[in-house]
Amino acid sequence: MNLSNHFLVAMPDMEDAFFSQSVVYICKHDEDGALGIAINKPSPITMDMIFSATGKNIPMRMQHDSVMMGGPVQVDRGYVVHTPIGNWQSSIGVSDNIALTSSRDVIENISREGAVDKALISIGYSSWGKGQLERELADNAWLTVPADEHILFDIPYEHRYAAAFAKLGIDPLALHGKAGHA
């Protein structure tokens, strides 16, 4: 099972302080573990803080975007999920069109026409060790659904959890994570 380019959708009864009602975009998943970015948890960092550090102006299309809290790991670093993939110093290709980049050059060029079409900026990331995510899935902590660029980039962050459930065709109020296994 490879969940790269999928959303993890937290079950409604998840009690973890950070991951409760989270949607996590999985950027890398292999036998060694998984790495993702929470796409619906705003951070206290502003776009102005991010772009002023590079001496660049915030692109008009991102003026009202929030910087996400991507996860509890390396919260002192920035990460950008973006299209198109491009040629950046430190990127992971997630799909044919989406990459996760952690190098400053993507931020410095994000306002340049055509360099980046769509972007979600976060601080920190989410990580699971070898077999950890698979155990959490077996324990009914998460639902999975193929990622959707519209949810990832276009829907306001506060509506992404509901949108992910809608993509699953499930009413979150009808779920309970303590189901048994046959």
Curated annotation (Swiss-Prot):
SUPFAM superfamilies: VC0467-like (SSF143456)
Pfam families: DUF179
Signal peptide feature range: none
InterPro entries listed in its UniProt record: AlgH-like
A GO cellular component entry from the record: cytosol
Family named by the database record: Belongs to the UPF0301 (AlgH) family.
Protein name (record): UPF0301 protein NMCC_1249
Higher taxonomy: Bacteria, Pseudomonadati, Pseudomonadota, Betaproteobacteria, Neisseriales
